Amino acid sequence: MMLCRLLEDLDCTLVQGRSDIEVNAICCDSRSVTPGCVFVCLPGQHTDGRRFAHAAAAAGAAVLVFEGTLPNFEFSRSCSPALVQAEPGKARRVLALMASRLYGYPARRMTMIGITGTKGKTTTAHLLAAVLTAAGRRVGCIGTNGAVWPGQRHTLGYTTPESCELQHILRDMADDGCDACVMEVSSLGLKMDRVGGIEFDVGVFTNLSPDHIGPGEHASYAEYRAWKSVLFRRCKVGVVNADDRETPAILKGHSCRVVRYGIAAPADWLALPGFTPRRTADALATDFTVRLPGGRMADFTVPMPGAFSVQDALAALAAAGVLGVPVAAMQAGLRGAAVRGRCEVVPCPAPFTVVLDYAHNAAAAESVLTALRAYHPGRLITVFGCGGGRSRLRRTGMGEACARLADLCIVTEDNSRGEPLEDIFADIRTGMDRVQNGAACVEISNRRDALLYALGLGREGDILAVLGKGHETTIDRDGRKVPFEDAAVVREYMERVK
């Protein structure tokens, strides 16, 4: 595409170079620069993208986009990219709109569903994708578990990728025949304009509780909530949780039609009281009945435990209903859905059940462990840790929740990011000590050793809940990511004791 076409009506100005040059890609990471691409220098908390302008130009970038100035920037005859100055604070917006235009507005070629909230985004996204697939749609899914569509799976660095990566993925999905995309839209994804230029057909709100508050994230809970609410000014229909107390704030200033789902509050999609937990060899399922819009009743099964899974399923069903999916397809899709690392039961010949879940804060841990209690385990054993370089309140909260709800806690590492484990463990113990007559605790620094120890304790009827990493395939030790997967350790143990 010609640069002049790419720059039309954007908040930026060509300050040096020609506008009639061809560009073929766009990126914001200098390591991804290819000859003929646009490199956008993004301002950041720890570094400034302008520092990498020389490297990008040397690698063949045809255009550099930046805010402010490029200090001490000199070109050689063989390295003289066009320079585009973005208006102050607009570089991210310019990146998003450029990427959307360059890749042919791929979001317009698909039905776009965006899901936001503190908990349940990944589960809701994958349940909805399964339901839409059962209805005959070809569906892509973007979020914490990566970018996935039929025959393709790609890992991502963020729940909501940077806009240049996101638009490239959307183009690949659309070119591969996808007619729907379900994606997780994080608060930072909205704040950093990663979804700029996308109008969602459906926006979904799951729930809200304090999280992602601190340096590099959000300055306050109010700011966190405000950015979540932006989605409902960028979608045609908003599907919201009638039971969540923050829903009115999320809908403040909304411009969409609203559909509500819930368990307790009046809702268009209402789950009736009396969920039935079912425990089988390969699943902890929940049966429930929904009163649909218009008053009809329908029975559903979600292959996951707990009221929170019913709530996530309701969100998916309500969104599917907005899109005209028949009830029979909803039932079949939901029943056969699987979500990696979200209350995932690892198939094993042992007489106890192993559940993997991504829960990494107090609210999520409490939801999971409360749900597992409904299956009346002999003992509920949990293995968990907390990440380094994150809020200490998350650690004390996790410790308190696990001590209150489990019979035995095995505390271990979880992405320490260079912070001493003894400091992390001390914060977890502080939370556990708040609980009178709480669970017994064992500390084992190495996560593999901790898992093997817990598996060795398992008896008939027990449930072993492994929390924190879920789908992840690496662990961060001292700032270095090394291969590690909870499920692989479980499978290794089961092979050994067969």
How would you describe each model-predicted region?
Residues 1-97, 270, 279-281, 297, ...:
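N-terminal leader/targeting and accessory segments in enzymes
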Residues 25-28, 60-67, 182-183, 237-241, ...:
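Short, hydrophobic beta-strand segments that form beta-sheet elements in well-ordered domains
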Residues 10, 92-242, 246-257, 314, ...:
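Phosphate-binding loop of NTP-binding sites
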Residues 66-69, 185, 207, 242, ...:
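Short secondary-structure boundary segments
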Residues 49-61, 82-89, 200-206, 224-226, ...:
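A short, gly/pro- and small-residue-rich
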Residues 1-14, 32-38, 48-51, 255, ...:
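ATP-dependent carboxylate-amine ligase
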Residues 38, 63, 202, 237, ...:
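Well-ordered beta-strand positions
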Residues 9, 57, 71-76, 175-176, ...:
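Acidic, Mg2+-coordinating active-site environments of NTP-dependent enzymes
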